[in-house]
Amino acid sequence: MADLKAFAEQLVNLTIKEVSELTEILKTEYGIELATSSSVATGVSTSVVEVREEKTSFDLILKGVGTNKLAIVKLVKELTGLGLKEAKGIVDNAPAPLKEGITRNEAETLKKSLEEAGAEIDIR
């Protein structure tokens, strides 16, 4: 079963060029008709293109607060613009989303600030 999963993972991660080469190998070495192999290749290459589109919107998730909870609450309040009660609610309910739909750069900057204060952060 593990071998099949590894094989499936390799297929999903093929580039368009590799799919084209695979199509040619299936045609020449195994006699699989071009129409059959090209429709398979088209389906695979469409999936590959969709999977490899770069993500532009990220969510910042507070996973844990460490030992300095008060500093994290203050920092969450400052970085999100929330009130003290709302910021404390997020910290108390970790894991919880801090900011959603932000850029990669903003997410990395906020993550660095929060981790320096002792928080455990995840970017999704």
From Swiss-Prot:
GO biological process, one term: translation
Top-level division of the source organism's lineage: Bacteria
This protein's GO CC annotations: cytosolic large ribosomal subunit
Gene Ontology molecular function, alphabetical: mRNA binding; structural constituent of ribosome
Pfam families xref list: Ribosomal_L12, Ribosomal_L12_N
Recorded coiled-coil stretches: none
Classification via SUPFAM superfamilies: ClpS-like (SSF54736), Ribosomal protein L7/12, oligomerisation (N-terminal) domain (SSF48300)
Keyword terms of this UniProt record: Ribonucleoprotein, Ribosomal protein
Disulfide linkage: none
Sequence similarity: Belongs to the bacterial ribosomal protein bL12 family.
Record's function text: Forms part of the ribosomal stalk which helps the ribosome interact with GTP-bound translation factors. Is thus essential for accurate translation.
Subunit note: Homodimer. Part of the ribosomal stalk of the 50S ribosomal subunit. Forms a multimeric L10(L12)X complex, where L10 forms an elongated spine to which 2 to 4 L12 dimers bind in a sequential fashion. Binds GTP-bound translation factors.
Protein name: Large ribosomal subunit protein bL12
Native species: Azobacteroides pseudotrichonymphae genomovar. CFP2
Gene name of the record: rplL
